[in-house]
Amino acid sequence: MSKQTFTTTFAGKPLVVEVGQVAKQANGATVVRYGDSTVLTATVMSKKMATGDFFPLQVNYEEKMYAAGKFPGGFMKREGRPSTDATLTARLIDRPIRPMFAEGFRNEVQVINTVLSYDENASAPMAAMFGSSLALSISDIPFNGPIAGVQVGYIDGEFIINPDKEQMEASLLELTVAGSKEAINMVESGAKELSEDIMLEALLKGHQAIQELIAFQEQIVAVVGKEKAEVELLQVDADLQADIVAKYNAQLQKAVQVEEKKAREAATEAVKEMVKAEYEERYAEDENLATIMRDVAEILEQMEHAEVRRLITEDKIRPDGRKIDEIRPLDAVVDFLPKVHGSGLFTRGQTQALSVLTLAPMGETQIIDGLAPEYKKRFLHHYNFPQYSVGETGRYGAAGRREIGHGALGERALEQVLPSLEEFPYAIRLVAEVLESNGSSSQASICAGTLALMAGGVPIKAPVAGIAMGLISDGTNYTVLTDIQGLEDHFGDMDFKVAGTREGITALQMDIKIAGITPQILEEALAQAKKARFEILDVIEATIAEPRPELAPTAPKIDTIKIDVDKIKVVIGKGGETIDKIIAETGVKIDIDDEGNVSIYSSDQAAIDRTKEIIAGLVREAKVGEVYHAKVIRIEKFGAFVNLFDKTDALVHISEIAWTRTANVSDVLEVGEDVDVKVIKIDEKGRVDASMKALIPRPPKQEKKEEKHD
């Protein structure tokens, strides 16, 4: 295929697609230019079905530092593991694409997005999402797209599609919404306590904008799209399925209805093992034993899936016996740990999260050096999910994509209520340890984070709670579930997480397993989530009604003083010599920003006070008319030099020592002598003149005696 170019304009920026010039050995490849952002997307598919029981889709978003004209950091000077932003973007693209493959599709698919040039005012992630869908759509990979995504901002009551950097900074909303022509299938959002009505309108505005991008993709596919390949889908043997269902469906249904998680898992596993043992023995000599046993496992999974959904849609009974809109039992505890700066333990049924707060000087902020201009990140929310939380063994190591994503969701939910840097000049870190999990652990970590922040004395604007909503749909009828547990998440159609305060929503995240959901379902889920959120906030506020007025005794105390910008270099000193000396003497930590705000941190108030005294002395300036208790440091013929304070000296001219004539300075003053002086002049070079006689009353003039004449 020779190079073909397709051009349109979207959200005020040129959108150019090039096909047929690069990466021609991939199943499908596109170069998408949006503004000055350029993303290459290449998609490939394995020729055979993978052996696992899941769809092996891998989506990568690779940030090349050359795209922003930057050198990579570190000793190796080349790109290493993906940044947090790159990982989150890869997840953002994966989530709307995954539901668009057929049930039973098991071929491995890779979608690799490479950012080749970066424009901070034209979203590279949205260009990559567009390119991912288009590359799959024009390829021979059986993808049931296209899909597209947009970012939505909200400024002065107006919605803005794909806002630029300046607009996003002013926006009350940072929403990414993706979907197909028919429906929304992915949502990711942070918001400044916006109402459900505004959030719903934003979602619909986003989906409306998506239509333009999908239509553009369809035009391109019509010109350059390949015929889709015939691939084998995972299908079980119909006779085998009928046999197992007839014999064991009743037993499996009974096991699924056991209310307690561990007991239910044991009961269902017992039935499954019994069935597997029977069929393994029956077909022991069959050369297709492996395929048969794979089908047995798949059939049992489908039977469990069908029963969970039947219970909810027909009987309106959930596996643990709850009503459709009922939350599991709640418990909230603060001060679970001594010594730390704040801690909160939140439990919802069999899901439990411990959040631990650490406060630090602003010097501990994380420096983010990616494609965007370098910036400092003050608030960190980290999420850990150990395997013991679900009673299993497993891999331990660096945080995976899921943990990074859940941590970022909690971060977005909580950062909206944090005090400003001026109000609270600390770096803030929350670590969520999931101690037990049966679904919705990310939302439990948000609730625990609220407890830890308030217990630690962080003056948040309002407590935040989170809830996960689910959906069971047969295409015609549907049921929205409140507070989904693991089984409902696994066999359900939607995981819709909503976090916020009593005033409004601070974060949304939605993933679905079906092609999309309607505005009616979204509206119902948001309304149901609001009711649940308020119930959880009642429990949180009953435990701790408001942030404590004082920090924990173990937290660093802080005091801030303001100095003139031109005095910053005085406090720091040559090569940091002065500030290092202060820190060595007092044991404090000191941060100085570019505006002259000096923050002093220590657990010892006396050390803070001493540091303030030292810095005040360093930046103090002599003023005309002020009196100082000075020390003579040098004597010259023309006068004496005195030290007013710290490094500020003044000259007392010989004529300013006394009202009477002084013949020799050394007759009146000596080095080391303390004297009181008054500043009488400061010249344009900062040189100070002082006077001793100005503090002495001027003696009256003596009248000349008249001579007597005889």
Swiss-Prot record:
Residues 625-693 form the S1 motif domain. It catalyses: RNA(n+1) + phosphate = RNA(n) + a ribonucleoside 5'-diphosphate. Mg(2+) binds at D489, D495. Its EC number is 2.7.7.8. Gene3D superfamilies: GHMP Kinase, N-terminal domain, K Homology domain, type 1, Nucleic acid-binding proteins. It is an enzyme of class 2 (transferase). It is found in: Cytoplasm. Its cofactor is Mg(2+). InterPro entries: ExoRNase_PH_dom1, ExoRNase_PH_dom2, ExoRNase_PH_dom2_sf, KH_dom, KH_dom_type_1, KH_dom_type_1_sf, NA-bd_OB-fold, PNPase. GO terms for cellular component: cytosol. Involved in mRNA degradation. Catalyzes the phosphorolysis of single-stranded polyribonucleotides processively in the 3'- to 5'-direction. This is Polyribonucleotide nucleotidyltransferase. It comes from Streptococcus pyogenes serotype M3 (strain ATCC BAA-595 / MGAS315). The gene is pnp.
